[in-house]
Curated annotation (Swiss-Prot):
Record's keyword terms, sorted: Methyltransferase, Mitochondrion, S-adenosyl-L-methionine, Transferase
Organism of provenance: Saccharomyces cerevisiae (strain ATCC 204508 / S288c)
Record protein name field: Mitochondrial MRF1 N(5)-glutamine methyltransferase MTQ1
Biological process terms in GO annotation: methylation; translational readthrough; translational termination
Purpose: Methylates MRF1 on 'Gln-287' using S-adenosyl L-methionine as methyl donor.
Pfam families: MTS
Additional notes on this entry: Present with 13200 molecules/cell in log phase SD medium.
Binding-site list for substrate: 188-191
UniProt superkingdom: Eukaryota
Upper taxonomic lineage: Eukaryota, Fungi, Dikarya, Ascomycota, Saccharomycotina
EC number(s) reported in the record: 2.1.1.297
Residues binding S-adenosyl-L-methionine, per UniProt: 118-122, 141, 188
Localization per Swiss-Prot or TrEMBL: Mitochondrion
Main location (coarse class): mitochondrion
Catalytic activity: L-glutaminyl-[peptide chain release factor] + S-adenosyl-L-methionine = N(5)-methyl-L-glutaminyl-[peptide chain release factor] + S-adenosyl-L-homocysteine + H(+)
C-alpha cells in the first residue's frame, strides 16, 4: 500500500481540522471528506469530532464510533466484539427480500421460518423478518455479546417474532432449541482463510473486529452439508471464495441421495466476486422457492429428481 504524501496531509489539514487524521484509513481525500461529513452528521452527542478523528487515526472502525450501520431499511446497532454488517451481505439479503415480495408467497402470505446461523448483530434475520410478510426466525450465535446485541437491535428496529439461541453451531451436540424444520437457512460464517487474514484484511478489521467471526476454512460448510441440509428446504450461505462453493457443490454432487434432491447455485456480488452458495431441496416448498429465485444467481447443479423440469442450469 503506497504511503500518504506529506502534501496530501497538509492539504487535508487546511480543509478541516482533523481531516488529515482520517487519511490512514480512508486513503483518499475524497473518501476522507465523505467520512468527515458522516461524522459531523451522525456522531453521538457525547463525542467530539476531534475525538472521532483520533479514533479513526487509531484504525477504530467507523461503525463502532457512530455505533450503527444502515442495513436495508434497518439501522443496525454496532458494538465492539461483534462483526460489523457488510454491504456484500446487505446486497444478497435485499435480493432475497425482493424475490420473495415479487412472488406468489407474498400474495398468499404463506408462512416462512428462517434460521440464521452465525447471526452476529442479527442484521440478516432482522432484515428478512422486517421485509417479508408472515415470517418468523431463529437466530443463532455462540457469542454472548452477539445475542445481547440482537436483542437490542430487535427493540430498536421494532422487529418481533424471533427466537434467539446461544450455542456453538460447530459443536458435536446440537441444541434442543434449534428449529425442527426450516424453510430458508441463512448464514454469514467465518470464511477468511488463515493464509489470507494477515495479508488481505484491513488493519481496522484485524485490530478491532472479532477474529472468531472472520477466520475459517471449510468447517462451517462441512457443518452446513452434514447437519443443516436435512433440516431445511433451502439455504443461502455467504462465501469468501469460489473454493468454498466448490466444496459444497462437490459434496452434494458426489452423494447419490443429496444429488437427487438438491439443486445448487452460485451468486456473484456486484464487484464480480463469488459471494453466495445457495440451494433448494426437491420438496413442495423447496420447488416453489427454486422457481422464485430463478434469477438470484446461476444454478450449477440441478437435482436429478427435477431433471425433467426446465431450469436455468449451466
Amino acid at each position: 500500500m503506497p504511503r500518504i504524501s506529506t502534501s496530501l496531509i497538509r492539504k487535508a489539514s487546511r480543509i478541516r481540522p482533523g481531516l488529515h487524521l482520517l487519511l490512514p484509513e480512508c486513503r483518499t481525500l475524497e473518501q476522507a471528506k465523505l467520512e468527515y461529513k458522516w461524522l459531523t452528521e451522525e456522531l453521538p452527542p457525547d463525542k467530539s469530532i476531534r475525538w472521532a478523528c483520533l479514533q479513526r487515526y487509531k484504525h477504530v472502525p467507523l461503525q463502532y464510533i457512530l455505533r450503527s450501520q444502515p442495513f436495508g431499511a434497518l439501522d443496525i446497532v454496532c458494538k465492539p466484539g461483534v462483526l460489523i454488517p457488510r454491504w456484500e451481505t446487505e446486497e444478497w439479503v435485499m435480493a432475497i427480500i425482493r424475490a420473495l415480495n415479487n412472488s406468489m408467497l407474498s400474495r398468499h402470505t404463506i408462512p416462512l421460518h428462517i434460521c440464521d446461523t452465525f447471526t452476529g448483530t442479527g442484521c440478516i434475520a432482522l432484515a428478512l423478518s422486517h421485509g417479508i410478510a408472515n415470517c418468523t426466525f431463529t437466530a443463532i450465535d455462540v457469542s454472548t455479546r452477539a445475542i445481547k446485541l440482537v436483542k437490542e437491535n430487535m427493540l430498536k428496529n421494532k422487529v418481533s417474532g424471533g427466537k434467539l439461541v446461544q450455542h456453538n453451531i460447530l459443536s458435536s451436540k446440537a441444541s434442543d432449541e434449534y428449529p425442527s424444520h426450516i424453510d430458508i437457512l441463512t448464514g454469514n460464517p467465518p470464511y477468511i482463510r488463515k493464509r489470507d487474514f494477515n495479508r488481505d484484511v484491513k488493519t481496522s478489521v484485524k485490530l478491532f473486529e472479532p477474529r472468531l467471526a472472520l477466520v475459517g476454512e471449510l468447517e462451517c460448510y462441512i457443518n452446513l452439508v452434514n447437519y443443516w441440509l436435512p433440516k431445511t428446504d433451502s439455504f443461502f450461505y455467504e462465501i469468501g471464495d469460489v473454493e468454498q462453493f466448490n466444496y459444497v457443490e462437490r459434496r452434494i454432487k458426489e452423494d447419490s441421495y443429496l444429488s437427487r434432491i438438491w439443486s445448487i447455485g452460485l451468486k456473484y456480488d456486484s464487484n464480480g466476486k463469488a459471494r453466495v452458495v445457495y440451494g433448494f431441496k426437491a420438496t413442495p416448498k423447496g420447488r416453489i422457492l427454486h422457481q422464485i429465485f430463478a434469477s438470484f444467481g446461476t444454478i450449477r447443479h440441478l437435482a436429478t429428481a427435477l431433471s425433467g423440469h426446465k431450469a436455468n442450469c449451466n
